[in-house]
């Protein structure tokens, strides 16, 4: 009976350790993807120079503002 209890305790410790490592990897992945998104947004703003370009729809402009020309 004592061996069973010890085995259950060891299994619980191993499972909780595994869960901690998975959580850490998930947080690292989220941080990495968030950084990529932020970098892409910065780059888009940096290279966005369509002001006074003719347009028909807002999505054609960097700032999504179209009144015949991008604003």
From Swiss-Prot:
Main location: secreted
Tissue: Expressed by the venom duct.
GO MF annotation list: ion channel inhibitor activity; toxin activity
GO CC entries: extracellular region
UniProt subcellular location: Secreted
Keyword Disulfide bond belongs to the record: yes
S-S bonds: 48-62, 55-66, 61-70
Keyword annotations of the record: Cleavage on pair of basic residues, Disulfide bond, Knottin, Neurotoxin, Secreted, Signal, Toxin
Residue positions assigned to the propeptide: 20-46
Signal peptide residues on this chain, from the entry's feature table: 1-19
Pfam family, one: Conotoxin
Domain notes from UniProt: The presence of a 'disulfide through disulfide knot' structurally defines this protein as a knottin.
Family named by the database record: Belongs to the conotoxin O2 superfamily.
Name of the protein in question: Conotoxin PnMEKL-032
Protein source organism: Conus pennaceus
């Amino acid at each position: 009976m004592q061996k069973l209890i010890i085995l259950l305790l060891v299994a619980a410790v191993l499972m909780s350790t595994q869960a901690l490592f998975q959580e850490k990897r998930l947080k690292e992945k989220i941080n990495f993807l968030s950084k990529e998104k932020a970098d892409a947004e910065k780059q888009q703003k940096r290279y966005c120079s369509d002001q006074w370009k003719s347009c028909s729809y807002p999505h054609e402009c960097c700032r999504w503002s179209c009144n015949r020309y991008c604003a």
